[in-house]
Amino acid sequence: IPASIAGGASSSKQRYLHKLRYRVRSMGLAADISFTGQRDDLKNILAISNLVLSLSTQPESFGRTTLEALRLGVPTAGYDHGGVGEILHTIYPEGLLTFGDIDASTKRIATLLQQPSPVPDDDFYPLRNMLSQTLDLYEQLARAPRR
């Protein structure tokens, strides 16, 4: 199954990207895994995907890519931590992976590729609500007594 690793790497992550590319080549997977680099059309890449993976070892505060893929109706799997875990718990629990459990994660990913569960068609985390809640929080903090 061909795979794409979409997105660029910041200057602080160039060494990691180099190691990742080397590992792909050394495992003989260069014909199967492509690195897209920075793209302005990530939404299009997500939309044509059979499965989107969010496998950051560091918990993300929000998990925007996960939410974008799910909003496009694309099955998505990711580690059960940070924003990715919260989003998957709410929208697509079938995609939850236990961090560090490679065997179980591999089996879950294979199942999602062979028999994907449909992604619910709903407007989860609407932008208007998120902005309103964020502004409400800022207003509460601004009114709170200072210590």
Predicted regions mapped to residue ranges:
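Conserved acidic donor-binding segment of nucleotide-sugar-dependent glycosyltransferases
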Residues: 90-103, 111-114
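Short alpha-helical segment that forms part of, or immediately flanks, the ligand-binding pocket
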Residues: 43, 66-71, 85-86
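Acidic donor-binding loop of glycosyltransferase active sites
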Residues: 47-61
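Short hydrophobic beta-strand element within catalytic cores of glycosyltransferases
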Residues: 75-78
